[in-house]
From Swiss-Prot:
Ranges that cross the membrane: 112-132
Source lineage: Bacteria, Pseudomonadati, Pseudomonadota, Gammaproteobacteria, Enterobacterales
Record bears the keyword Transmembrane helix: yes
Domain HTH cro/C1-type: 19-79
Residue spans of biased composition, Low complexity class: 229-241
Name of the featured protein: Cytoskeleton protein RodZ
Length: 345
């Protein structure tokens, strides 16, 4: 009997039972206790039934019991030893702290990725620079080679520039010496092709003997003296050369022949804005020009079309063919030696 009584007393001495008895003795309900402790009614019920919530830490559970004991005027020292025997303090499950190693790994991986990206960019830039430098060196070598070829051609020609005349045009040599006189009559001048240069004034100077009237010698001499005085008043450039008939006009010079060929059909005009190496070859294979032109120079060429042009610096000149401009923009943009053929479209 004593053993059963002690077991009943042990059962009634649980913290939940004692708190419930104290609450009932004060005439309080679970709802009232929950409102005063700012807890849920289910939490008060679990405390009175000695049910420890699995998701509730033991520290909070003990705190709720202490607050409940103060509310119903029970000493805490009597409840805590019983609570420790009934439910020992459980070690709180502490979640393992996530280290920053994962973030460091991500940063390290991002660092490697950025380094690899920069390496690719540097390699691309290096290849681009090497490609540009090789093209530049090739252009410089090509220009130097063309200049050497031009110098060699000039040395083979005896240092004389290439003549700028058309193959079909006959060059007229200048006649600075007076025309020879044979038996009192002027000898007709001939050009390189052997054709005689005649003048209508020479023909008209021969008197026609169609009239039978006598000629007054005195009047004729007077007239000749008057004509001599009138010719003395003429400018020196109009004075006839010795041995040349008075009424004969001056012969055309070589300058007139050059200007005529420059203004002929198929003329090629080049205006230079800077120093530039140039080579022009016509359809017959004749080199019309090969060398360096200074800035500000104007070059007029005439030959048999089409023309093959090799230009060292396309941006240093403008070209017009038969009055129409020649487009060099693609060579200027590419920054390379221009090789083109100019012909009638």
């Amino acid at each position: 009997m004593n053993t059963e009584a002690s077991q009943d007393q042990t059962v009634t001495e649980t913290p939940g039972v004692r708190l419930r008895q104290a609450r009932e003795s004060l005439g309080l309900t679970q709802q009232t206790v929950a409102e005063r402790l700012c807890l849920k009614v289910s939490t008060i019920r679990d405390i009175e039934e000695d049910n420890a919530q699995a998701n509730l830490a033991s520290t909070f559970h003990r705190g709720y019991i202490r607050s409940y004991a103060k509310l119903v005027h029970l000493p805490e020292d009597e409840l805590l030893p019983i609570l420790e025997k009934q439910a020992p303090v459980r070690a709180a499950k502490v979640a393992p702290m996530q280290s920053f190693s994962l973030g460091k790994k991500h940063k390290k991986r991002d660092g490697w990725l950025m380094s690899f990206t920069w390496l690719i960019v540097l390699v691309v830039l290096g290849l681009t620079g090497a490609w540009w430098w090789q093209n530049h060196q090739a252009q410089q070598a090509e220009i130097a080679n063309m200049v050497d070829q031009s110098s060699a051609q000039l040395s083979q020609n005896g240092g004389q520039p290439v003549p700028l005349t058309d193959d079909n045009s006959d060059a007229i040599a200048p006649t600075d010496a007076p025309a020879p006189v044979a038996n009192g009559q002027p000898v007709p001048l001939t050009n390189h092709s052997g054709s005689a240069i005649t003048n209508s004034a020479t023909t008209s100077s021969v008197p026609k003997t169609t009239s039978t009237e006598p000629v007054d010698t005195a009047n004729t001499n007077t007239t000749m003296h008057q004509e001599g005085a009138a010719s003395a008043a003429v400018s020196p450039s109009q004075v006839p050369q010795p041995g040349m008939p008075t009424g004969q006009p001056p012969l055309p010079t070589a300058d007139a022949g050059v200007s005529g060929s420059a203004s002929s059909v198929g003329a090629l005009v080049m205006n230079f804005t800077a120093d530039c190496w140039l080579q022009v070859v016509d359809a017959t294979g004749k080199t019309l020009f090969s060398g360096i032109q200074k800035g500000g120079a104007v070059l007029n060429l005439a030959g048999k079309a089409p023309y093959k042009l090799t230009i060292g610096a396309p941006g240093a000149l403008t070209i017009s063919y038969q009055g129409n401009p020649v487009d060099l923009s693609k060579f200027i943009k590419a920054n390379r030696v221009a090789r083109l053929t100019v012909c009638v479209e």
